[in-house]
Amino acid sequence: MGTFCSVVKFENLQELKRLCHWGPIIALGVIAICSAMAMIDSVLWYWPLHTTGGSVNFIMLINWTVMILYNYFNAMFVGPGFVPLGWKPENSQDSVYLQYCKVCQAYKAPRSHHCRKCNRCVMKMDHHCPWINNCCGYQNHASFTLFLLLAPLGCIHAAFIFVMTMYTQLYNRLSFGWNTVKIDMSAARRDPLPIIPFGLAAFAATLFALGLALGTTIAVGMLFFIQMKIILRNKTSIESWIEEKAKDRIQYYQLDEVFVFPYDMGSRWKNFKQVFTWSGVPEGDGLDWPIREGCHQYSLTIEQLKQKADKRVRSVRYKVIEDYSGTCCPLNRGIKTFFTSPCTEEPRIRLQKGEFILATRGLRYWLYGDKILDDSVLEGVSRIRGWFPRNCVEKCPCDAETDQAPEGEKKNR
């Protein structure tokens, strides 16, 4: 626990505001309900503390809760690690291999990406997780993955307690008739009688907690296997997408080149050790990374620059012909536009008649692009980009001649 205490200090207490979000509220609520009900069921109705097995079981339940909460808060409050504001590579000549972030006023270090929610460039960013209200990245990847492992294991233990409690409490209350089965919930037929009878309210609460435990085991368990796949390959979700686009770019232009992902060390054990260490602190500093033979530190960033240049070539300029409020599912834009709204966390952008948009990808009834801002407004302002209805814009005449479809548009028609 030394890592947690050394990073989360008094001056970082402003991070407590991360708890004021629907994700942590739901996550902590599920943990509290499952833990509390498992302990109550064990002590009162299933495995009393005066028995050896009951004591061991109770200690294990407390242990699960402590370890789950420790790794959860570690992932939330320690965070992924952010690229320092104004960061530049040690060798100024290397800046040509890096993208520049206008919001952070810094170059994007290898493997880092800008998060719109955190409003910072994140080291080795995998994704922004709403359940911890923070990004998963370089510093908290191990804690986040351990939380994904411990939560299902603890829920499996709790689910066992719930099932056995309901079974033992209901078994002697069942009465079978010729055509009916009745359950007497008035009192327990057990000697000695429990301090609090297992009534209808207790049964409903236990059944509800069982549903939460089983749902958490399945959902969070799947996320754990996804994260382990990422760790063993040393390739984040974003980097997998970059690699896929690299192959598409090479195939589209029929180039005589091969993209090799530079951070997979060729050994799952070596990849694993970069995230999980005995000290609890991941290897490296989050800015410079070990690379495989035949690659160099900027192999991935150079590919990103190529993809960015290719996206600019493929982008299409549109003019806004009708205002759009930026709502997720606009009813006034037509029934098809309403029902085909993109299912993504990416934002919608407000449009005003006369503005210009540079579209980079699209669906049949929606487009995604950047607003073209004036030079007087552009400096110091982050890019305004997102989804908008296709029927709010028209293609500019100069781009209509090329008839170049935005990326992804043909595939989604």
From Swiss-Prot:
The keyword Transmembrane helix applies. It is found in: Endoplasmic reticulum membrane. Signal peptide: none annotated. GO terms for molecular function: palmitoyltransferase activity; protein-cysteine S-palmitoyltransferase activity; protein-cysteine S-stearoyltransferase activity. GO terms for biological process: positive regulation of mitochondrial fusion; protein palmitoylation; protein stearoylation; protein targeting to membrane. A motif (Di-lysine motif) lies at residues 410-413. Keywords: Acyltransferase, Endoplasmic reticulum, Lipoprotein, Membrane, Palmitate, SH3 domain, Transferase, Transmembrane, Transmembrane helix. The active site is at C129. One of its GO terms (cellular component) is endoplasmic reticulum membrane. It is a multi-pass membrane protein. Residues 1-24, 79-143, 216-413 are cytoplasmic. InterPro entries: Palmitoyltrfase_DHHC, PFA4/ZDH16/20/ERF2-like, SH3_domain. Homooligomerizes. Interacts with SELENOK. Endoplasmic reticulum palmitoyl acyltransferase that mediates palmitoylation of proteins such as AMFR, CALX, ITPR1 and TFRC. Palmitoylates calnexin (CALX), which is required for its association with the ribosome-translocon complex and efficient folding of glycosylated proteins. Mediates palmitoylation of AMFR, promoting AMFR distribution to the peripheral endoplasmic reticulum. Together with SELENOK, palmitoylates ITPR1 in immune cells, leading to regulate ITPR1 stability and function. This is Palmitoyltransferase ZDHHC6. The gene is ZDHHC6.
